[in-house]
Amino acid sequence: MDKYTALIHDENFSTLTLNVSRYPKSLAYWEKLLNYIVKASAPICKSTEPQLLKLIRCTYSSMLNEFPYLENYYIDFALLEYKLGNVSMSHKIFQRGLQAFNQRSLLLWTSYLKFCNNVISHQKQLFKKYETAEEYVGLHFFSGEFWDLYLEQISSRCTSSKKYWNVLRKILEIPLHSFSKFYALWLQRIDDIMDLKQLSQLTSKDELLKKLKIDINYSGRKGPYLQDAKKKLKKITKEMYMVVQYQVLEIYSIFESKIYINYYTSPETLVSSDEIETWIKYLDYTITLQTDSLTHLNFQRALLPLAHYDLVWIKYSKWLINSKNDLLGAKNVLLMGLKFSLKKTEIIKLLYSVICKLNEYVLLRNLLEKIESSYSDNVENVDDFEIFWDYLQFKTFCQNSLYSSRYSDSQSNGLLNKELFDKVWKRLSCKEKKSGQEILLNNLVQFYSKDTVEFVEKNIFQKIIEFGWEYYLQNGMFWNCYCRLIYFDTSRSYLDKRQYIVRKIWPQIDKKFAQSVLPSLTEFCESYFPEEMDTLEEMFTEEP
């Protein structure tokens, strides 16, 4: 029996695949399945059965679809393809991983560049990769390994040392964890200079003359002049060293030393509140530096361990909106946050507003439909009231957008069509089983127009009274909302409103609920009908 046949008939394999199909969001089950397949297929080489290789590839790919932030698995997958001789496929896997991180994964870049060092012989093509990596991860606090690789390739592939000097000089200005190593390289390079002309490789002639008073065309005794020039260079280097050292110590002591998780964590893993707080402070600090590339990078770093927490997604999108006016970028961040975060309420709310500002009503509709379908088309049963109310508001907005017909059902009964109104009624019928019922009633009073007061009164307030739902009838806010519905009806005169509330609404209140209802009604009366305070008091204090 071949390995593939033996594997698919293996009882353990069946159990592992069943666990993955039942719990696709469990990283532990995916890892167990992948490890089992790889172990059963060992040694994996070009002669391994094609069916086994296909199974391994499918498992890797499916796992990375579910968990796109697994840096190490992109690397393992890519290097496996390299081992099998599929260089182009390795490139694609690395690039797929980098795309998942918006090109901002230091681990993926260093692994990819090591791979590129071995397979790309064309110098320009290779250095283009390094330049792209520099753009995205060059400012990373722990990017020392990347810069080491870059300098190493420049040394081995470039005949001129000017590029080396340029890159090294750039590194000196970055607060890196391993900054002292690069300063040592710089000072060693200065010591190795044997001719004044070589100083032009450090910087331009004009800058040397203007800032350091060093003339590389000096015609006097060049030996002593060169030594003096080196002293000036070392002096300014040490001054720069002190500045960068202070920055590094500050960043490390306040932030980096308190961050222990620098990798993706599954939804089951809890990150300590102290570490989360450190990340938030670190991001605030980064934003104040006003270096966009570093801000993007540190947000991406924070999302690695905190992908399932909504606060980083929200903070990132708000920075894009408020500081960069980048609504499109904020939308993409929030859509990713919706996929990862366990708490979605605030993300959805912010995403709704961003989509509306972008006038992407089709996307808004699709999002609302997905949210509704995720609750089996019973969004009114969601425990979180904010999700329900936001859904209601934006569904209404979407129906009344330019894409809706002016004769559509959304206009027939005011602002909510029959479908949405039914959802409101179902939510209210849950009474104390659902949160936010008072807020819902209060919002409905404000939500409807003057033309629909009668409809709301008949189908909400009178219906609840008719059904005798004590949860509402003993709640002063219910009666307060009912009174305000009538009071804010602009089609009635002040006298009509007053008489209707005093003669029609108040008498419907059971006096056994007087103690719980009276405070809220008193508040209403003091605000709108102070002259009826005595009437209210008499109505609820007289003996039955």
UniProtKB/Swiss-Prot annotation:
Residue spans of the HAT repeats: 7-39, 51-83, 85-118, 121-156, 163-195, 255-288, 290-322, 366-397, 456-488
One annotated GO molecular function: RNA binding
UniProt keyword annotations, A-Z: mRNA processing, mRNA splicing, Nucleus, Repeat, Ribonucleoprotein, RNA-binding, Spliceosome
Cell compartment(s), UniProt: Nucleus
Keyword Protease: no
InterPro entries: HAT, TPR-like_helical_dom_sf
Recorded GO CC terms: commitment complex; nucleus; spliceosomal complex; U1 snRNP; U2-type prespliceosome
Alphabetical GO biological process terms: mRNA 5'-splice site recognition; mRNA splicing, via spliceosome
Residue window of motif Nuclear localization signal: 230-235
Function: Essential component of the U1 snRNP particle, which recognizes and binds the 5'-splice site of pre-mRNA. Together with other non-snRNP factors, U1 snRNP forms the spliceosomal commitment complex, that targets pre-mRNA to the splicing pathway. U1 snRNP is cotranscriptionally recruited to intron-containing genes. Required for U1 snRNP biogenesis.
Misc. comment: Present with 1730 molecules/cell in log phase SD medium.
Quaternary assembly: Component of the 18S U1 snRNP particle, a subcomplex of the spliceosome.
Official protein name in the record: U1 small nuclear ribonucleoprotein component PRP42
Chain's gene name: PRP42
